[in-house]
Amino acid sequence: SGSETIRGDMIGKEGEITRVGSDGSVGAAQVIDATDRIVTPGFIDAHTHLDAQVGWDPELTPSIYHGITTVLVGNCGVTFAPVSPGNEPKLAEIMEGVEDISAKAIMTGLPWSWTGYGGYLDAVQKLKPALNIVGLVGHAAVRYDVMGDRAIDHDAVPTDDEIRNIADRVRESVAAG
């Protein structure tokens, strides 16, 4: 915020800061002595590739160890939804090319119980991640879902129908979260 730091007390309830004071009058049922420490809001990591890691590491280490409380997944245009049944291995392979995680680990680490982006977000929440997860829908998944293997050909141009279908998938994904 650009504000000066303050030395003081704060009280929190249910994950929210509810009161700040500097006169020692902020009482609480539990006291954490943070003398000579810095208390900050959680940090947002706006560029991660934790889309698959949440499947086998719902604490999303080491992000949580660095004060990260919210991560943005779906960067570099690669996501795991939307996906048509049977195309999951291709999305895992595409992610393997971006992130140094084997497609086999991705395939076994995620439940793959979805087709749409909202289903992916629901599946992630069922894993009970320790951090807030927000996402982008990746163009690679959208194009592959609509165009199949043609999406991988750099010279392939989507047809007018494919462009309409791509736009529909993006609208559906945005509406889903």
Regions found by a protein language model. Give the residues of each.
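Activation segment
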Residues: 21, 52-54, 72
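Fold-independent oxyanion-binding glycine-rich loops
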Residues: 20-22, 34-35, 42, 46, ...
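Divalent-metal coordination cores built from histidine and acidic residues
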Residues: 56-173
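Short Asp/Glu-rich motifs
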Residues: 29-30, 51, 82-83
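Di-metal (Zn2+ and/or Mg2+/Mn2+) metal-binding site signature of metallo-dependent hydrolases
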Residues: 38-62
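Histidine-rich, glycine-flanked metal-binding segment
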Residues: 1-42
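Divalent metal-coordination and catalytic microenvironments
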Residues: 15, 36, 47, 67, ...
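Short capping/connector residues at structural and topological boundaries
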Residues: 10-11, 44, 55, 147
